[in-house]
Amino acid sequence: MKHNTPFPIRLGLLLLAMMASVVLHAQGGQFPFPSVPSTLRTPEDRLQYLGIHYWDRFDFRSQSLLADKDVTEQGFVNFIDLLSRMDSLTAARSADAFVTKAFAQKQSADTFTSLSHHYLENPQSPLRNDAVYVVLLRSMRRRKGLTPTQRQGLDYKIRTFGSNLPGQRAADFQFVDRRGKHHRLSDYRHERVLLFFYDPDCDNCHRI
């Protein structure tokens, strides 16, 4: 599944649903948001409910719905934005609820695997968020019936995207200074180091 359209913009409907006592109903061409109970008063409780029940009204078996970018793709964009606002436990529970439903059918699984890659793995995505991606990957890894190859692939991605997250100790690696001399980050344990990361194939980057 290719995504050639511009990245959708995150909407404010989710925060509205968390903060106000509103009921969001499914309408034609709109994502079928869950109804957040008015008895849930705090933003934390509303956020938790919305995350876990976000996909309750979505029909993962509908091919036409899966192909509707205004509904499915934008709904997924809003969901990953929602995950980024949660504590780790709530995010994991919400991701588990999503994966259980989304990966029960092959077409749905293929659609959301592609969307996850497009928005959370693509370096050009303004929504790229390794921490959120790892939450989803771990939920995918907990699924039953995975082949050894699928497990290995998910394990590799979890290790890769789970490294050097905010708040973690940076993994040791080699870098080259402006004179072409090679160093390791561990050589500067008690010093501050300013590193410039760039694409080796980017000609303009080499000129900076």
PLM regions and their residue ranges:
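Short active-site neighborhood of thiol/selenol oxidoreductases, capturing the structured segment around
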Residues: 183-206
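Oxidative protein folding and maturation machinery
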Residues: 27-172, 177-178
